[in-house]
Amino acid sequence: MTWIDRQDDLKNLIHEVQPDALWIDTEYDNQRYFSPRLALVQIAWSSGVAVLDPLEVDLSILNGWGGAWYSHDGTHDWLLLAQAGWRPPSTCLDTQIAARLLGYERFGLAALVEDVLGVAIDKTEQRSDWLRRPLTDQQRRYAEGDVVHLRSLTSVFEEALRAKALETAWAEESAHVLARGERLLERQPKAFTKIKDLRRARPEVWGRAQAILAWRFEQAKVQNIPEFRVMNDHLVARMAWGKIRPRERSLALALKAAEPCPWPARPAPKERSKKLEKALKAWRQEQAEALPMDLSMVLPTRCIERIAQGEEWRSLDELAGWRSERFADSLDQAVS
């Protein structure tokens, strides 16, 4: 493994190694900052491994280097690297999606490495302080191991996907995930509908909760800390119910200005919609068991809901491409 924490060493890597593909993982801290802070970048290629220190080197010089990217559940990895200046290439492939397409029941990297490769990963260092310098030897070994195992896992998955003619499906689904992931950068305050303790409240309580959540979001951004460190959801609910009073003047003013807010309305399901949704779920289950394939890969639940509400399935972007080619005839029958 090569440890890189100097810009000259990173430049040398670019000149000396010209890989067609990279296996990528990151470590980051999402417990102490408003936005996750990139702490480590692990990369592997066919004949080597390097660990980059993003606290010391400028990753933007890597743009255009290295070919396709392979990651596991890679949305956050790709977005964090883009924020650090290293933009994802046109081809990014997610091995978690490959596992779902192939019908594996456990999707975590450690579980797949154990199930597919027969290797048990020691996860002791997973929650360690990755921003601390210097890293311990145990941290370095852990960081190196993930991309090495990811590289081996990819070889197995690619062969299996090829045998089932699912390579295009893998590429298309990975592209959808990357496109959806870009919306994660557009941070918004948490919706009050996501807080369990508020589900049976009144519009006045919901209005106060919305005001508190907006205040919490701005405070977290200014202080550069996670929102839960400003105020956790339980306290948000208690304050919205009027069980505790605000100490901060700015929060008191926000609550005073809060107006009643209705619970977002959902269209009432029609009898036809309920029957169609049930039929689509039964069709999805049948297809998933026959292939085998994860349910979400056959037909995402959000697509079932939209079709049940009257949208034509061929108009949905996610159902174009490989799904249309593989499922069109039987899906037409399920919808009819």
Task: State where each predicted segment sits.
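Accessory DNA-binding and partner-docking regions appended to nucleic-acid-acting proteins
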Residues: 137, 157-336
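Active-site-adjacent beta-strand anchor residues
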Residues: 71, 143, 229
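Short, surface-exposed recognition loops or helix-turn segments adjacent to catalytic cores
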Residues: 93, 124-132, 162-174
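A short, charged helix-loop
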Residues: 111-138
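C-terminal folded domains that constitute the principal catalytic or ligand-binding module
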Residues: 139-145
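Conserved RNase H-like, two-metal-ion catalytic cores of nucleic-acid enzymes
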Residues: 1-115
